[in-house]
């Protein structure tokens, strides 16, 4: 964050300085003097620096003065001295309003200059002026030293200003390009991240909604199916019981005495209460199944709310981080403005003495340092973005694992429901078998009572048991014992058939 703030601070400083201070200087010196063969100064520079105004004397000393200041009067050849003295004389003639000026002296040509000297010799006034200027060349050199140095300093200042302005524009352009590219990349990343979040959220919501609807439909269908089966079975059983009960009531009157013992044995074994207990257990199991389905529905709803809460918390945290970054950027801008005021005062106080020796190398080093820090910041941001992506993918993987666990639990519940349904059907088949067996026994008893041969056999057996002979010492088994054995065998058979259901 500090490196980012430093980059923004530098960008604002460069932009402000290059656009305000250097802009003012460039606006004032935009029309600065272009030193060519015909040195012409603009109105702004002439008003700010009067010594830059183009004059006849200045034009006359244009070639002589730089050589004299740099190497001394002895290094200047005679032709240049003569030409300079002639031009100075012409300037005096023009300044004094002299009407007659030698025509050959108005042409910048070496041959014309020799003709000009011959014409100057023809007049004592002309020659005296020329001779005086030629003798004063050494003093003229030193008299114009300070204006010449001022002009050279101004040239240096303008050149440095132009260099600094060009450098500032280049840095500003580069930083603007980098900032634009960074903003574009950041915006693209945020757009991709937001789009990814929306896709994940939509997929998760769609999957949650589809799974919830499927689960509710399956549970509702199974519950309705079980209720329908139980209702239909109970109705059929009730109707059949009523019908058979009416038939039995009509037929039991005829065989009441014969079946009384069998009824007593059945009452002792309490089969009816066992059937009712099994029925109550089945209903309790179905009730537990309904409650378990409701618990699964509530658990799935809580998981859905938890996922939505996690996504909302993550979105709020991301918004808070972006708000913090915006606040830091605002604070950086305020600090940049405060530092810029001090920077401007330092710039005005130490521009000329430190521009050549300090600022240009420091700006070059600063540019290199800035590029290095920018590269490091870019790599750091890439690492942070990669870390954020890993955390996001890890969070969604955890959510997927939780959903898979919920699916496994639902599969387990479905298996248990299938097992309960299977046991209920087995119990129904056992009850049906018991009903058919009872029906068959009653029918057999009814047919036996109506059959005359059965009564004949019973009479023979009774007479035989009452009047048995002494030769045959056989102990007859009473009929009651037969009934008891039959009831015992029936109980054993029914226990074998219903044992697995009772164990469950």
Curated annotation (Swiss-Prot):
The induction comment states:
By mating pheromone. Expression is directly controlled by STE12 as cells respond to mating pheromone.
Q: Where in the cell is it found?
A: Endoplasmic reticulum membrane; Nucleus membrane
- Side of membrane Cytoplasmic, spans: 471-481
Please indicate which superkingdom the organism of origin belongs to: Eukaryota
Intervals, Lumenal compartment: 20-452, 503-504
Q: Name one Pfam family in it.
A: Tht1
Q: Which residues form the signal peptide?
A: 1-19
Q: What is this protein called?
A: Nuclear fusion protein KAR5
What InterPro entries does UniProt report for this protein, alphabetically?
A: Nuclear_fusion_Kar5
Q: Which residues cross the membrane?
A: 453-470, 482-502
**Similarity-based family:** Belongs to the KAR5 family.
| Key word Membrane present | yes
Q: Which GO terms describe its cellular component?
A: endoplasmic reticulum membrane; nuclear membrane
């Amino acid at each position: 964050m500090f490196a980012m703030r430093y980059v923004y601070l530098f960008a604002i400083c460069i932009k402000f300085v290059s656009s305000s201070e250097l802009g003012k200087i460039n606006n004032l010196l935009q029309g600065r003097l272009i030193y060519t063969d015909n040195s012409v100064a603009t109105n702004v520079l002439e008003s700010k620096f009067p010594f830059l105004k183009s004059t006849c004397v200045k034009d006359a000393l244009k070639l002589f003065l730089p050589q004299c200041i740099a190497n001394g009067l002895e290094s200047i050849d005679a032709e240049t001295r003569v030409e300079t003295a002639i031009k100075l004389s012409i300037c005096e003639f023009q300044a004094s309003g002299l009407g007659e000026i030698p025509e050959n002296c108005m042409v910048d040509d070496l041959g014309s200059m020799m003709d000009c000297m011959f014409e100057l010799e023809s007049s004592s006034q002309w020659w005296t002026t020329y001779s005086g200027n030629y003798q004063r060349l050494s003093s003229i050199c030193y008299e114009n030293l300070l204006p010449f140095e001022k002009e050279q300093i101004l040239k240096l200042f303008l050149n440095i200003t132009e260099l600094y302005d060009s450098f500032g524009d280049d840095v500003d352009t580069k930083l603007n390009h980098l900032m634009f590219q960074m903003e574009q990349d950041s915006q693209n990343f945020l757009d991709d991240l937001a789009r990814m979040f929306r896709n994940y959220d939509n997929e998760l919501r769609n999957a949650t909604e589809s799974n919830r609807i499927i689960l509710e439909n399956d549970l509702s269908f199974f519950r309705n199916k079980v209720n329908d089966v139980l209702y239909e079975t109970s109705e059929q059983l009730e109707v059949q019981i009523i019908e058979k009960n009416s038939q039995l009531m009509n037929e039991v009157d005829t065989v009441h005495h014969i079946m009384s013992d069998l009824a007593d044995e059945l009452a002792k074994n309490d089969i009816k209460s066992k059937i009712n207990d099994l029925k109550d257990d089945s209903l309790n199991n179905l009730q537990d199944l309904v409650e378990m389905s409701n618990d699964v529905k509530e658990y799935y709803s809580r998981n859905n709310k938890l996922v939505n809460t996690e996504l909302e918390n993550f979105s709020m945290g991301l918004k808070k981080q972006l708000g913090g970054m915006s606040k830091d950027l605002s604070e950086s801008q305020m600090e940049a403005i405060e530092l810029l005021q001090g920077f401007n005062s330092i710039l005005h106080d130490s521009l000329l003495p430190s521009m050549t020796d300090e600022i240009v190398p420091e700006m070059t080093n600063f540019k290199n340092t800035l590029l290095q820090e920018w590269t490091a910041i870019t790599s750091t941001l890439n690492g942070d973005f990669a870390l954020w992506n890993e955390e996001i993918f890890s969070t969604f993987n955890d959510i997927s694992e939780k959903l898979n666990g919920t699916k496994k639990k639902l599969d387990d519940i479905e298996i248990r429901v299938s097992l309960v349904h299977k046991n209920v059907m087995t119990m129904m088949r056992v009850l049906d078998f018991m009903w058919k067996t009872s029906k068959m026994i009653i029918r057999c008893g009814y047919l036996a009572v109506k059959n005359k041969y059965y009564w004949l056999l019973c009479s023979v057996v009774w007479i035989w048991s009452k009047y048995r002979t002494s030769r045959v010492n056989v102990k007859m088994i009473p009929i009651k014992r037969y009934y008891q054995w039959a009831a015992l065998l029936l109980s054993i058979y029914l226990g074998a058939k219903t044992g697995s259901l009772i164990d469950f």
